[in-house]
Amino acid sequence: WNVAISARRENTLKEISESNENIKSFPLDVTDKTKCKEVFEQIKNHYGNVDICFFSTGTWNPKKEKDIDVEQIENVFKVNFFGTVNSIKAVEEYFKNKNSGIITIVSSIAGYRGLPNSTGYGPSKSALNNLAESLYFDFGRHNVRVCLVSPGFIKTQMTDKNDFKMPFLKTSEFAADKIYDGLINKNS
């Protein structure tokens, strides 16, 4: 496989891409619609063909205030939901014209059930669930598979911020293996 990766943290991207010659990094802030399109064009130009896009956008800032923080919720939606929408919009025409491919959207179990101090995160992931279900039909007419992945608690920098019990906490490697198996075996 040849893999293109994108994220805001360029130093992390560089570290990952230097560890494997089949991985190339393309820095990107998914909140920038224009940049999403530009980066996808760069990826297409570099590889010539794209078969799978895997969108795992996310930010999580637990809030313990007793009042709702509207600005914080808007920021979480800007990254988690609209960042994914921007990314999918950037690839939409390509996949529909190609009449094949897989678009994978990473949500969370938090999209199905609220979590403590999570007035932005859970609702943003719930919105992704609904988006994926809608796109399943819209892209399906073009033979493009839309998959929704809703993992439980995965040990990451984001979950390190949690101060509540996280049952069945798994490593990112474990999650990646399960997600890969599900996509390859069409269990999504």
Language model features with spans:
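Rossmann-fold cofactor-recognition segment
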Residues: S19-T34
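Substrate-binding pocket helix/loop in short-chain dehydrogenase/reductase
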Residues: K64-E65, D69-F77
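Active-site loop immediately N-terminal to the catalytic Tyr-X3-Lys motif
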Residues: K66, L115-T119
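Active-site helix of classical SDR
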Residues: I88, S124
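Residue(s) in the substrate-gating loop at a strand-loop-helix junction
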Residues: S108
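C-terminal helical subdomain
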Residues: L148, F164-S188
